[in-house]
């Protein structure tokens, strides 16, 4: 696990951004913590930003909800949050691979940043370290990546 977080973007200087978060209800305690941290970080970095949080039953359902949000063209970036634990079978890997590919496809098809924090973890210890703490929380990382990428795209668009 990386011990460093992405650089915290500067405070907003102009029009606020709009963010979507799609979160899995499965392994709720971990995902809820990531969602809370992501929302708090988005509000700190982009005061007044619009943040829409949508819950889906499990990680496999995240991409379709992300696609619906992306198709609306109302969001500058969308964050996907979930926790999948590896078990004795290949099921978790199949879910993780499918979700990863689908999220990238949505991002490319709709030209919207999709920040992928659907975590494939070995155990609860890894989940606690990545989801519950404030120091290396993946929700915070997702929010920082969403803000930085959305701002970059806003800078690029007028040039072309």
Task: Pin down the residues of each PLM region.
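Short gly/ser/thr-rich secondary-structure transition/capping motifs
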Residues: 1-5
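Short beta-strand segments
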Residues: 23, 80-84, 115-119
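Glycine-rich oxoanion-binding loops at beta->alpha junctions
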Residues: 54-72, 117-119, 123-125
